[in-house]
Every structure is written in structure tokens, then in C-alpha cells.
């Protein structure tokens, strides 16, 4: 099967996200990359779910780890009857899909696809674990190819020799965006806020940009306004953990404040991804509150006195009036007209997963 991760950075290659083989799922530990290149080995699907919860893999990484975890679950129950295997896999699907509250709907969709593939493989007498693994690769190809289309539309918004600011780690879109810039001969420079407390901007986004040969600068999270004002930023762009059909954008905490500054500075903010039919309005969003102790440290080194309190909402919500456009694989849409996305193209369940 031809793969869509060709010419992308190390971090975006399928095997370096999550990979099932020989009764194990290996997940690149993004919590410590690039200082260390280590993989967490999961020998049960529960361990895969725990790795997702514990942020071993982040951004779109769970969308590879989850179906690979389903392949592992199929391997675990391979000696059972067909009915028993399906029952086991349904329980595994619940465990994996509920590993992180904010992405539960998309993860459920992914796991449902794996369940259908398991039913098909059982009926055909095939190896269920390998069938789900191959389905995962197929899903990745679909997602990466869609991201390439999104990258092309997004790059249209970049001026030659332009300056782009990101936030957190937009995963595949970063790689496909840069690959498109390179293919067009369009030179850009990038500013990446570090994105505490996990430093995804510094460790992941900046690493991908550097790996692919682009001028990239890491800034602290309190610098975006200064940089937008003094470094002639042309575009602010992020991906999203969810794009509600009413135009609200759910993404890594800090996106909202950067969007406010961008609006004030007259800098367009483009969010990338597909509208989420599972979130018709922002009212269905649950903001995940994580361990507040993470805000009291930096890469494991405590920065605050004992007894000081922390506060850690993982995401925030940017209202549509701050969004210049939603960049999809079908083009760029107004945040107030997202339902048109679903009438403009024939979107199947497999293709809804970003």
C-alpha cells in the first residue's frame, strides 16, 4: 500500500507516531522529544488508552494510536469465538475512545470504523489484528492526503517571503503545509510559541519546521503580541481539536488570546480542519481540566514554591468573529457558513476523521 507520509519530517512518519507489531504498540514519547527519542511500548489496549490520557502522544497522534490500539485489542482476543472477539473489541473501543474527553466523539468514530473492519475480517476469515492495522494505514493515508489539500489552500494565503505564527502542534498540516511551500518555491519564516506546559510548539512544531529546512524561531507564550507587532507577521494559523458547526474553534489553551491579538493587529487567523458534525454548537464542548501541577513546573523542574496552586484548562474556545476562515480540503469557508462544507462534498464516515 502506497503511503502518504513521504518526504515528511521524522515526527510525522507513521511508524514514529504509533505502530502495532508482534503484539505491541510502540508510541513515540512526544513528552520528551526531541531531547530524547524514545518509544513507549504498550502490551495491552488499556496501556494504549493510558498513553493517550498521559499525553505520550498529542495533537493528531491519538488518531493513529487509537486504531493501532484496536489492532492490539484484536490480537489480545484472537483465540476467542467470533462473538466473543466482537464483544471484547466493543469494550476496548469504549476504553480507547474515552481516553481524552475533548476528542471523545472523533475517537469514537475511529473506533467504530475499526469495529466494522473487525466484523468484515471475521466474516472473511482474515487476521483481525492485521486487518485493523491495514485499515489504520488506509485511514492515515486518507487523512494525510486531505491535509495535503488543506495545506495547499493555506499556502495560498501566505505571501512570498511571508511570516507565519503557529500555536501548539498542528501535526500533519505543518508537514504538508511546508512540503507545499517547498514544492512552490515559496519561502516563509515561522514563529512558534513554546506552548506550555508540554512545550509542543518548541519541541514538536519547531522540530518539524527545522527538519524540513525552514527558518523557525521559538518564542515564549507571553511574546505573541510583541512579535505580531514588531516582526511583520502575515498570518496566524492553528489546527483545532474541534471546529463546531457554529464556527467556534476549540484548540490548545492560548489560541483565543492570540486570535484576539491577531484581530487587533489586522492579521488574519486561519484555522485548519473539517467542521465537526458531532459538535453542532459550542454548547456540546467539554473543556478538559488537567493536573494543575503541570503549570507549576517546566519539563519536570518545579518553578513555583510548594503550596502555590496551579490551574490547567487544556483548551480554550475562540469565537467565530475572530476567525478569518476555516481552511478545509474543499476550500476556505467562513466560520458562519460551515454547513456548506457538508453539501459541497461527498464525505463518508472514514473521511470525517482529521
Regions found by a protein language model. Name each.
Residues 36-46, 124, 129-130, 146, ...:
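Acidic-glycine-rich active-site phosphate/pyrophosphate-binding loop
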Residues 8-124:
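Long amphipathic alpha-helical segments
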Residues 69-76, 113-116, 178-186, 208, ...:
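A glycine- and small-aliphatic-rich helix-loop capping segment at beta-alpha/alpha-beta transitions
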Residues 145-152, 174, 218-221, 251-254:
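Active-site glycine-rich loop that binds ribose-phosphate moieties when present
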Residues 167-216:
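Glycine-rich phosphate/diphosphate-binding loop of Rossmann-like nucleotide-binding domains
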Residues 132-169, 173:
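Active-site pocket-lining segments that scaffold enzyme catalytic pockets across diverse folds
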Residues 195-354:
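Conserved phosphate- and dinucleotide-binding cores of soluble alpha/beta proteins
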Residues 112, 116-143:
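HTH-adjacent hinge/linker in prokaryotic transcriptional regulators
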